[in-house]
Amino acid sequence: MRLRYIYAVLLCVLLAANVEAQVYIDSTEVARILGRQPAQTAIVQEYTVEDGEGEDDTGIPEFQTDARLSWKENIKARLDGILQGSLVETTQVGVMVWDLTDDCSLYSYRERMQMRPASTMKCVTAIAALDRLGSDYNFRTNIYCTGDSVDSTGVLKGDIYCVGGMDPMIGAGDISAIADSIKAMGVRIINGSIYADLSFKDRDRLGNGWCWDDKNPTLTPLLYGKRDEFTTRLRSRLREMGISLSGGAGERTLPGNAKLIVTRTHGIAEVMRPMMKQSDNLYAEAMFYQIGAAEGCRWSSAKQSATYINGLIRKVGLTPNNYNIADGSGLSLYNYVSPELEVQLLRYAFKNRNIYDTLIETLPIAGVDGTLKSRMRGTAAANNVRAKTGTVMGVSSLAGYLTASNGHQLCFAIIINGGMRNGPMRSLQNRICVALSQ
């Protein structure tokens, strides 16, 4: 009687506990369902999920492997168990895993559901940019001058034109190098103004579907330290070097008779690294607009870039009308993709080494760097998973590559919409990655 009372008390405590539980069904249960053995008691692994989990995942238990099942069946058993928890009941979850070695689907769960991707949208942008522009592409900022040659007294009777190419990496070193090039012409006085040519992209300073009260990047073709301060900084640097200007600063389109002074460049891989490793939204938008500009039009727009991406979606065998590409960073509320789309683009990249070799070097590495530095540490996924994270209010996602225990190369996408806490959503993603890695 006393023993029953103790059991009752313990049950009440467990029911009152404010936790979420994910339940794993062991592979032996799958074998029973497949009819390979008599009914047995399934081994159930219970794992408590607290808010904020995912920052340190040393507590993720090892997954059991049933020798009677194939590798693929063991993977299915593990992922089916992970996806039986309460989080899946209260949110929208989509998962797809592709075996790149055998070139076939390994696992799928609501993989065609249209969902907001958050920053895994940057994978779409990166792959499309490398496909359209190539791995040798450079972001360019060109500086021109008008007027005759500098006279014997060091006077330039003309204007300086700064033609922006939406390079987010322009910094103090670039401004100094530009000023040095102007001084090297023998210029001491500029009888003219400094103009910004902003015709690289349209006039939209914010992306379509961005929340006005968020901390959003400013979308301008001429940047300095991520700010719209290029011409101001150049004027200041010229004055510091003893070069005076008689005119002011403004915006004007480059005239046809202007002469090139200097070009500052940054390579696509150089820009893509912070875009992916640190999930920099401005860098992603700059990358996105390069795609549209590559079509040969001035005033590049998000629509032009999306048109190219829609063509790529068609190229990988999917229907563009099933998705909506609104921006390059994933900030827009109007982006809608699916795990299947992200996986098929990752698969396409893997098959094209000119894309993959650059992309794989820019993705965060679990437990090592970027936005995955503090995730999956001490697990089989650490230093193995290379993937892009995604987080906005109510959305958490993860998409990338890993190597399975049998040596197979895999790509995957996990998108969760509707969750109110990041911890449980990230924890589910982490456990899937560990299950695939073990």
Q: Where does each model-flagged region fall?
A:
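C-terminal soluble interaction/assembly domains
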Residues: 324-438
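Beta-lactamase-like hydrolase cores
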Residues: 26, 31-101, 107-111, 178-184, ...
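Active-site SXXK
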Residues: 103, 117-135, 194, 233-238, ...
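Extracytoplasmic
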Residues: 88-92, 110-112, 118-121, 136-138, ...
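Second-shell loop/turn segments in exported
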Residues: 61-70, 108-117, 160-170, 179, ...
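Active-site-adjacent, His/Asp/Glu-enriched structural segments that form or flank metal-binding
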Residues: 135-202, 210-217, 224
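A small/polar active-site loop signature that marks catalytic segments
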Residues: 225-360
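Bacterial Sec-dependent N-terminal signal peptides
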Residues: 1-27
